[in-house]
Amino acid sequence: MTMNLIQLLKGKWRFKMIISIWAMTKEGLIGKDNQMPWHIKEEFQHFRRQTLHKTLIMGKNTFFSLPKVFDKRKMYVLSHEKDFKIDHPDVEVIYDYKDLLKEYANNDKKDIYVAGGLYVYQQLIPLSDILIVSIVKGSYEGNKYLSVDFSNFVQYKQPEIYDQFSVYYYKKKDQKNSI
């Protein structure tokens, strides 16, 4: 991604925040064959609480891995296939995340939650203002690993500790707004 796009998105055009939210093991495992390698009810509930009544962006494979379309959320599904369509009132297919970010740029009331998968996280975590990261305890098998450079982020509140995972909250270091 070019620095010009980042400057454009973070400068003149401004939406409230880009928030990336995901669960991973301490090794960075996030998926196995387009599914989550774990089924932790409390972690799913945490995701639901964080994203309810919000706008989400995710990749096509992530969308198809969902048990159903999430209720009470606007969902944008990123696809490189120009003829790909989804017929649902709360779901819109987009072909370039930059267009979506430009559309939301002047909206200072809406956050955009990045909800996976690997490619979408790799593109949008560097643009994110907030990271909400669940670290899942235990060992799991999988084939999708996310490597995140946390050097531009700082933990801004105490982790939430659960039996099977812990949630960490980070904000971008140069963020001027208090959280």
UniProtKB/Swiss-Prot annotation:
| Residues noted as binding substrate in the record, renumbered to the chain | I21, W22, A23, E43, R48, R73, S134
Name the pathway: Cofactor biosynthesis; tetrahydrofolate biosynthesis; 5,6,7,8-tetrahydrofolate from 7,8-dihydrofolate: step 1/1
Q: Where is the DHFR domain?
A: 17-179
One Gene Ontology MF term: dihydrofolate reductase activity
- EC number(s) on file: 1.5.1.3
Would I find NADP among this entry's keywords? yes
Q: Which GO terms describe its biological process?
A: dihydrofolate metabolic process; folic acid metabolic process; one-carbon metabolic process; tetrahydrofolate biosynthetic process
Please identify the protein, giving its name as recorded: Dihydrofolate reductase
Q: Which organism is it from?
A: Mycoplasmopsis pulmonis (strain UAB CTIP)
Gene name, Swiss-Prot/TrEMBL: folA
